[in-house]
Amino acid sequence: MLEDEYQLDFFKNNGFVRKQCQKCGKFFWTRDPERNTCGDAPCDPYSFIGSPVFSREFNISEMREYYLSFFEARGHTRLDRYPVVARWRDDIYLTIASIADFQPFVTSGQVPPPANPLTISQPCIRLNDLDSVGRSGRHLTNFEMMAHHAFNKRGNEIYWKEHTLELCDELLTSLKVDPFAVTYKEEPWAGGGNAGPCVEVIVHGLELATLVFMDLKTDKKGDILIKGETYSKMDNYIVDTGYGLERFVWASKGSPTIYDALFPGIVNELMGLAGLEHELNNTEYSNILAQNARLAGFMDVSEKANLLELRKKVASSIGMTVDKLSVIMEPVEKVYAITDHTRCLTFMLGDGIIPSNVKAGYLARLVLRRTLRMMKDLDIRTPLSEIVDMHIRNMPEYPEFRANFPVIQDILESEEEKFNITMERGRRIIQKSASHFKKTGEKIPLSQLTELYDSHGIPPEMAKEVAADIGVGVEFPDNFYSIIGELHNKAEEKEEEVIPFAERLKHLPKTKRRFYDEPTRLEFEAVVLDVFDNHIVLDNTFFYAEGGGQPADIGTISVGDIVYKVVDVQVYEGVIVHTVDIPDGELEITKGDIITGKVDERRRMTLARHHTATHIVNDAARKVLGKHIWQAGAQKFEDHSRLDLSHYKHISPEELKQIELLANRTVMENKRVITEWMPRIEAEQVYGFGLYQGGVPPGEKIRIVKVGDDVEACGGTHCLSTGVIGPIKILKTERIQDGVERVEFAAGIAAVRAMQKMESLLVDSAKTLSVPPEHLPVSVERFFGEWKDLKKENERLKEDLARSRVYRMLGDASELAGLRVVSEQVPGADSLELQKIATELLKQENVVTLLASDLEGVKLVASVGEKAIECGINAGNLVREMSKIVGGGGGGKPALAMGGGTDPTRIQDALSRGLELVKEACKEA
């Protein structure tokens, strides 16, 4: 459908011909009239290995600088990289391409680009090919996309397809690439709600660049179909190019794999740690590795591609058995994958992602645990942090990673410990699951393996090993980890908000929010634009509408002598709706009335104090705990606030003290709170993406709030200076989910009240113990020690009592077919006490014990000695039947079982039933 898009003067004027690949069927452009294939792997093997494409070798830094300088010299502005965690997006977690830096606001035309045209080298992370990493020789989870972008509008074109191709060809020519070796393959592109024609730039089997011409947007009514979606033309159109930095370096060196080209030192180090040096020094192995590398383009593990079949293709081409090739290649491929994954982790953790079970943290843990699993397979015992440190030493252009290394190291050590615990626990979980499927004669299904990984972190390889010992089969696709990564790489799509009374509001103008301009003003006049039910819409307001974790203002709206309480304020697409309480059932305000509004001062100031304090506590936590701290959520109340922080371990009491101290110092410095509206792009360039701690607000301009050293995009109400907040008191902290710590605190009068409450508790506790408050810790420690001693003594006495009861019970036991039967109600005994007696009696091989108690309903315990079990008596069956009589249930093992019920009036009936069952068993025996 896009064929005409590729009929360009660039191709016609430079000797290109359009052909169709005889292998994949795709169309491509080439200067070589004899060429019949598109040049891409697997249609063509890697022919640059051992025969570099460029006139000289480049390392990563040199290639990056060459590219950026090339485009700077041709009118492009160089931009610094964005983080690999997409803080400015709420639809994706990771930066997957350079264009993601400018979505959605720039690409949609809402916001102007930071420069036009521009060039950037953007580190990216993609996990959709996770299982191909290490195997194909070319796949990476973490890569840098060198790019140049031009943002065009109808009537204001910077440049489009012709010049983009000219620049690409000129770049390759400057690197002395053989022009007859270059193919431009037609491949429509779609992603992120946009699409357009695209050409892939391929040299000697290797795709070096992708040139996307984004001019389409998703449209259900659109007439352009691409990859199953319908699109229509955009008003703006964008040059979106991506040049693979690592692939350019690889092409310049002609190394066997991209990993050898990028990380030769780390690959050699890991080969040594894995005990694979002999393979590298063996001529036969070296030849096999080289031949495999040329054909590794086949090894693209996907949903449709089976690993064994791919391996067979390569083995057949080399002329050896697939088993021998697998034995040689699998350990080497794991070394390559570990090398790649650890660089990916360097960027993830270095840019502030905390491993967890949700969002970007889930993806970091996915990569991390896959790495640890492969290291375990190769018996590499070096700490993960040491390998990450090697990468950091190789990347001096990222000094922020060196600065963050102590935190990165701490995170990795913590995660390794968690992984080992998971493996221990996971073995038991798999055994239980496998036992279930053994009974049904089934294999463990993929859905169960996915659940085991998602909920417990148990890798499918481990499930396969453990289940095999039980005789249960496990099968999972070769691209299992890619599937998992794909499931979690995007934020859940938000349900479209159902706007109440949308029809009524859509014709109204946006409400002027005057509380931003005059934050201390609480009384105002406004014109009523609409009234319905108990809702009022005004032309302007000083009432803050609920948002950003801050509750709405309350107060009054009056007309003449009639006063209504404002109980809620909400905003719907810019229109603010005031909800009032109508005691008499009728609202006596009409459209066009001029009302007087009064905001409740106490509530406004209390919430403003807590909101401003939230900024201060967040900043203090970042200074104490590290730059990785990120606000995962916040909610303000009148009596306290809570702040959820991404952090990899519990915040210690000492750290909390430091955070509280720093926060109060900021208050006492009485710094002015500065608010200003700034163009989004300018704000991002000045302050970075820490702006979006509280979420990503829409619009070309965003409101910036500076509180001390904290700078955020924020729409809430704040104090005019930090001194107005008053004291800040941290009340408690808890771990609400893996990787997230919740800090609760109070500010101002609420903090004073919280401290008074704590003081009252101390005073009351001191009175109870008859000591001064300052002696409370010593006294509590002494009393606790005495309590523990008394508890031990109590336990000892209980054991003595149990033993004495045992002797008495044995004396009172009845004889039955060579067995002794104890059947007794023990008044006031709890389950533990009954269990101790039964366990003691269990030492007698020929004793059957039936015990009951009426404590808190009915407690039942039965024990059966070894000889009694041989007679067919089962404690579990006894308790089950006895429990039915007292209105309950129970069970257990043949030797010991527990149960109970709710009807103590039938205890004797239950004991009698137990005795009957023993007699029946003895008769049958």
From Swiss-Prot:
It is an enzyme of class 6 (ligase). SUPFAM superfamilies: Class II aaRS and biotin synthetases, Putative anticodon-binding domain of alanyl-tRNA synthetase (AlaRS), ThrRS/AlaRS common domain, Translation proteins. Keywords: Aminoacyl-tRNA synthetase, ATP-binding, Cytoplasm, Ligase, Metal-binding, Nucleotide-binding, Protein biosynthesis, RNA-binding, tRNA-binding, Zinc. Zn(2+) binds at residues 611, 615, 714, 718. One of its GO terms (molecular function) is alanine-tRNA ligase activity. Coiled coil: none annotated. Consists of three domains; the N-terminal catalytic domain, the editing domain and the C-terminal C-Ala domain. The editing domain removes incorrectly charged amino acids, while the C-Ala domain, along with tRNA(Ala), serves as a bridge to cooperatively bring together the editing and aminoacylation centers thus stimulating deacylation of misacylated tRNAs. Catalyzes the attachment of alanine to tRNA(Ala) in a two-step reaction: alanine is first activated by ATP to form Ala-AMP and then transferred to the acceptor end of tRNA(Ala). Also edits incorrectly charged Ser-tRNA(Ala) and Gly-tRNA(Ala) via its editing domain. This is Alanine--tRNA ligase. It comes from Methanosarcina acetivorans (strain ATCC 35395 / DSM 2834 / JCM 12185 / C2A). The lineage of its organism: Archaea, Methanobacteriati, Methanobacteriota, Stenosarchaea group, Methanomicrobia. The gene is alaS.
